[in-house]
């Protein structure tokens, strides 16, 4: 969204898209990052990649409609999965059915005639925290997203780090239980099978349907653990034991990350965090402090569900600085 003279910069705008496993959010912003329009939708995952791409195209058009689309200078999308830094394809999004090697960026560039930047949703959110959130001014930190799944965005020496194949920060695959190395967690991954929204919802459902505890809310949504946190807030002992156990596992995973990266700050965000923020911080801090003599600060995001959107806007404003990923077939087009 950078441009030469002041008049063209004032007219320039970009769209940031937050694509989760179950939600879509579209934000139109000007060249200074000021939000102008916003639209929300639910992901129709059963429609497959084709249907979701059509949803995204419709959402982008919706935020552009009140303003002339001539202002569009770029689109940034955070996706719930890995993005190949070479091809720009969505390699996989294990919580959205059918997403393997999807060239969404190229399709959207062809549709809107503007550069499209894609990244893992946790990476986008980490960029947002670095720009406008609690990690502003901090060069070395790890952003951890706890929602339907689990992932992380890693900042080292002031830059987002994606690794060799673009999968740095995929904490969901981390195994912190030596006795379960032979278990097959397939696309879920060990840590995600213990601490994600899907995992907690599933485990809570088993306990409560066996007559342990008395949850409120629906037990039918396989991804929604809100009923579990409602029971926790009512003082249900079964719910507390389940959640505490999951947070201890998370703490061990965080301690491993700290051992390797030595960050100054750990930032938590996501629906699971909102369910029991004080208990999560207390438990994770206790575990990490037992393992590390100089543990990092562990804090909650100050941006909430805006983190990924701000990361997308920052990517549009400074694509070179963020080493932003574009579809390979369109590399070389003018920005």
What are these regions (language model features)?
Residues 1-74, 84-87, 106, 110-114, ...:
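ATP-binding/phosphotransfer module of carbohydrate and carboxylate kinases, centering on a glycine-rich
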Residues 24-28, 150-155:
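Short beta-strand scaffold segments in enzyme catalytic cores
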Residues 89-99:
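A charged helix-plus-loop insertion that forms the helical arch/lid used to bind
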Residues 116-120:
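General beta-strand structural signal in soluble alpha/beta enzymes
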Residues 121, 147, 312:
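Active-site glycine-centered loops adjacent to acidic/histidine catalytic or metal-binding residues
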Residues 125-131, 154, 173-175:
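Adenylate-forming
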Residues 167-171:
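Structural signature of FAD isoalloxazine-binding scaffolds in flavoprotein oxidoreductases
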């Amino acid at each position: 969204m950078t441009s030469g003279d002041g008049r063209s910069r004032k007219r320039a705008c970009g769209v940031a898209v937050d694509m989760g496993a179950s939600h879509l959010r579209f934000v139109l912003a000007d060249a200074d990052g000021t939000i102008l329009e916003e639209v929300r939708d639910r992901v129709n995952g059963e429609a497959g990649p084709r249907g979701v791409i059509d949803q995204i195209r419709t959402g982008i058009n919706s935020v552009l409609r009140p303003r002339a689309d001539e202002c569009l200078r770029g689109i940034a999308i955070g996706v719930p999965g890995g993005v190949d830094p070479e091809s720009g394809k969505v390699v996989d999004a294990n919580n959205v059915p059918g997403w393997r090697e999807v060239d969404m960026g190229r399709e959207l560039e062809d549709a809107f005639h503007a550069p499209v930047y894609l990244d893992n949703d946790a990476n986008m959110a980490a960029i947002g925290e670095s720009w406008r959130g609690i990690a502003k001014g901090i060069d070395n930190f790890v952003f951890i997203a706890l929602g339907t799944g689990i992932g992380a965005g890693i900042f080292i020496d002031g830059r987002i780090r994606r690794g060799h194949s673009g999968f740095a920060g995929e904490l969901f695959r981390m195994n912190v239980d030596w006795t379960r190395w032979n278990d097959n967690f397939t696309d879920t991954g060990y840590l995600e099978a213990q601490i994600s929204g899907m995992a907690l919802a599933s485990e809570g459902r088993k306990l409560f349907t066996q007559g342990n505890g008395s949850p409120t809310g629906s037990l039918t949504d396989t991804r929604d653990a809100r009923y579990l946190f409602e029971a926790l807030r009512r003082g249900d002992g079964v719910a507390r034991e389940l959640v505490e156990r999951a947070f201890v596992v998370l703490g061990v995973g965080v301690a491993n990350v700290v051992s390797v990266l030595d960050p100054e700050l750990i930032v938590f965000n996501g629906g699971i965090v909102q369910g029991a923020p004080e208990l999560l911080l207390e438990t994770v801090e206790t575990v990490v402090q037992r393992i590390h003599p100089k543990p990092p600060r562990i804090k909650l995001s100050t941006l909430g569900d805006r983190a990924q959107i701000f990361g997308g806007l920052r990517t549009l404003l400074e694509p070179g600085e963020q080493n932003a990923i574009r579809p390979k077939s369109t590399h070389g087009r003018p920005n």
